[in-house]
A protein has these predicted regions:
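Short beta-strand element of the conserved SAM-dependent methyltransferase core
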Residues: 10, 68, 91-93
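Short loop segments at secondary-structure junctions
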Residues: 13-15, 72-73, 96-98
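Hydrophobic ligand-binding cavity/cleft-lining segments
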Residues: 1-44, 157
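Beta-strand elements of well-folded, non-transmembrane domains
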Residues: 13, 58-60, 109-113
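Beta-strand/loop substructures that line and gate deep hydrophobic ligand-binding cavities in soluble
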Residues: 79-136, 152-154
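Glycine-rich portal/gate segments that line the openings of hydrophobic small-molecule binding cavities
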Residues: 30, 39-88, 102, 136-156
Length: 157
């Protein structure tokens, strides 16, 4: 059974610049929750079909593989695979008239393990931990967006 977790933030960037920051692998250590180091890039990142493999910090998710499934201007999605789960992570970039962009982050996932208590474990622990991780990622992403906005000639709010 597929499950979903969502989180959102607003950044002082255009959708194009917000997407550019989101897909900049050199910036991932500063905002992706649990990101340890990049292990491998296959293909032309961030184009459809490209794959990155990264390792988490100690005690984290282990090795994570992300393959680009959607690289459109307003949405970026990857098929994710790691020891505990697999699914799709998507980021949507929705511009507003005042020059800010809402970033909606979503993970649709299935657990790889869990046995007979998988559903209960997901409800009580895993889903909350994933949501917290998405929220921490987006908080740090928004903090990274402020200097990026200044470089683009915008004043962060």
């Amino acid at each position: 059974m597929s499950r979903a977790v969502v989180a959102a933030t607003v950044v002082p960037l255009s959708p194009e610049h917000a997407r550019g920051l989101w897909t900049d692998l050199e910036r991932w250590p500063s905002f992706v929750e649990g990101f340890g180091h990049l292990a491998e890039v296959r293909g032309e990142w961030p184009e459809r079909g490209a794959t990155v493999v990264w390792n988490s910090t100690p005690g984290g998710r282990g090795q994570v593989t992300e393959k680009v499934t959607d690289d459109s201007l307003r949405r970026f999605a990857t098929k994710i695979s790691e020891e505990a789960l697999q699914g799709e992570q998507s980021a949507a970039f929705v511009g507003a008239e005042d020059g800010v962009t809402r970033v909606d982050l979503r993970i649709d996932y299935e657990l790889s393990q869990g046995g007979p208590f998988q559903a209960m474990s997901d409800r009580l622990f895993i889903r909350r931990a994933l949501r917290d991780a998405l929220e921490r990622t987006l908080r740090r992403y928004a903090a990274e967006a402020a200097p990026a906005a200044r470089r683009c000639g915008r004043t962060p709010r």
